[in-house]
Amino acid sequence: MAKHLFTSESVSEGHPDKIADQISDAVLDAILKQDPKARVACETYVKTGMVMVGGEVTTNAWVDIEELTRNTVREIGYTHSDMGFDADSCAVLNAIGKQSPDINQGVDRTRPEDQGAGDQGLMFGYASDETDVLMPAPVTYAHRLVKRQAEIRKSGQLDWLRPDAKSQVTFVYEDNVPVGIDAVVLSTQHCDSVTTEQLREAVMEEIIKPVLPAKWLTAQTKYFINPTGRFVIGGPMGDCGLTGRKIIVDTYGGMARHGGGAFSGKDPSKVDRSAAYAGRYVAKNIVAAGLAKRCEIQISYAIGVAEPTSINVETFGTGQVSDEVLTTLVREHFELRPYGLIKMLDLERPIYQATAAYGHFGREEFPWEKTDKADALRAAANL
């Protein structure tokens, strides 16, 4: 029996990099509400007392960048200088310009279905049967821990919690099946008045125990709750934040490969984002169809070219049919040209701010999580 450990992490919506992601996607959503065909590439930088929003946009829409930024920071929970960041008093700098016409001519076409990819690149999609949402267990539970932290904080149940937090979960695998949790790390920002002992007890009882299944916790499971003992200075005061700096948190926690492209702030003509979503959709439907226990798909594009330059399916020896057969089925059942996948997943909508914290995958509210192709795939595979 082969045994190994695998670890994934997550961060809360109040982490500096995630603040930046959420602001970038708030800007994207506001523009898409007015102009679904807009071209947006929005980058955000946050540091003590300031937010800088930049990038390139092609649209006739007008949005109030300062108001969007302040509202986003306020919703996250940074509303007082005691937290090191305040939505109402921070400086907001706007450095957004226009997208290069050289890119436009490569993307825009007379026939919409001939729309070219907004850039070259490679993207991966992944799914596995080890959780109810067909995602790897380590990143799934890492997300749920920090999401629970935010819920408890916002409800006022633990009024000393602050927005910045991180989690990390190490699972024990036997023959590639999760059988237990070896270690849990949770660090949360807090106000100065709470003691370390109070914090550790409350985090264990109110955050960790309600989230992690008891079947995976043993007497040998190790817990590291605020292991430095103090986390008062956090958020943008503790570290600067940038859009696109949490790409492994955003995807599969390191369990699958990554093409390197970030998601937040990018409209769906950018295949870094839309094709990664399509890849998840493909992989999840293959696993949901029972055609494999684990599935990873790679898709690649050339700028200005509609057809993918490559499609490859890998099932790590768990497939009910060969990977070559699955690759053929993917080509037959999924539209992976940029225009086609945008239509397939209905991506020209303001749905992106919600993706910018707690992972883009494994959350049923998003269209790339549908398993509506599973029956057709299974039938086509003659299973």
Curated annotation (Swiss-Prot):
Any one Gene Ontology molecular-function term assigned to this protein's record: methionine adenosyltransferase activity
List of residues binding Mg(2+): D17
UniProt GO BP: one-carbon metabolic process; S-adenosylmethionine biosynthetic process
Catalytic reaction equation(s): L-methionine + ATP + H2O = S-adenosyl-L-methionine + phosphate + diphosphate
A Gene Ontology cellular-component term: cytoplasm
Protein's gene: metK
The keyword NAD appears for this protein: no
Main location: cytoplasm
Family of the protein in this entry: Belongs to the AdoMet synthase family.
Free-text remark on how the cofactor is bound: Binds 2 divalent ions per subunit.
Metabolic or biological pathway, per its Swiss-Prot or TrEMBL entry: Amino-acid biosynthesis; S-adenosyl-L-methionine biosynthesis; S-adenosyl-L-methionine from L-methionine: step 1/1
Cellular compartment(s): Cytoplasm
Name the record gives this protein: S-adenosylmethionine synthase
Biological role: Catalyzes the formation of S-adenosylmethionine (AdoMet) from methionine and ATP. The overall synthetic reaction is composed of two sequential steps, AdoMet formation and the subsequent tripolyphosphate hydrolysis which occurs prior to release of AdoMet from the enzyme.
